[in-house]
């Protein structure tokens, strides 16, 4: 959905 969700998925 949104950027925050994407970043949370990356978890670098």
UniProtKB/Swiss-Prot annotation:
It comes from Vigna mungo. Keywords: Allergen. Glycosylated. It comes from the Eukaryota. This is Major 28 kDa allergen.
